[in-house]
C-alpha cells in the first residue's frame, strides 16, 4: 500500500532557529543521529527507535522534526515511516549532520 507523505517545509524555507529548537531535545537529537548515521537514508519505522518515552510522546517528537523540515513522515494508515531529508539539510545547512556525530562530510574526510 502506498503511503501518504506528510510534508514539512521546502528546502529553501528551512529555518535555522526552528531546526535548532527541534534539535534541542535529547530524544529528537538521538533520532537524528541514528538517521544521519545510515548513509543509505532508508526508511525506518517509528517504533524502530529505542526511545524511553511513550508512543504519544514519540509521535510529538516526530511531528516536531517533520515541521522543522528534518524528516519526512510517510503515513501508511496503521504505521508511519520516517526518512531523513539529508539532501535538503545539506543543501541548506552544510555540515549540520556532521555536527550530530554522523562523521565528516565525504569531501572533508581526513586523508
Regions found by a protein language model. Give the residues of each.
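Amphipathic alpha-helical dimerization/coiled-coil segments
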Residues: 1-17, 33-38, 85-111
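Generic low-complexity, intrinsically disordered sequence content enriched
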Residues: 27, 69, 100-104
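Canonical helix-turn-helix DNA-binding module
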Residues: 47-70
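A general structural signal for short secondary-structure boundary/capping elements
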Residues: 65-68, 79-82, 98-100
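Short beta-strand "wing" residues that participate in macromolecule-binding interfaces
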Residues: 73
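Conserved acidic functional residues
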Residues: 25, 61, 94
Amino acid at each position: 500500500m502506498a503511503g501518504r507523505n506528510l510534508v514539512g517545509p521546502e528546502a529553501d524555507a528551512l529555518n535555522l532557529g526552528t531546526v535548532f529548537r527541534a534539535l534541542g531535545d535529547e530524544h529528537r537529537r538521538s533520532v537524528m543521529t541514528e538517521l544521519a548515521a545510515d548513509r543509505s537514508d532508508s526508511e525506518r519505522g517509528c517504533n524502530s527507535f529505542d526511545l524511553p518515552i511513550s508512543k504519544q510522546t514519540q509521535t510529538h517528537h516526530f511531528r516536531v522534526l517533520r515541521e522543522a523540515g528534518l524528516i519526512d513522515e510517510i503515513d501508511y494508515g496503521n504505521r508511519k515511516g520516517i526518512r531523513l531529508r539529508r539532501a535538503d539539510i545539506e543543501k541548506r545547512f552544510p555540515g549540520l549532520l556532521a555536527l550530530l556525530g554522523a562523521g565528516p562530510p565525504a569531501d572533508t574526510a581526513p586523508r
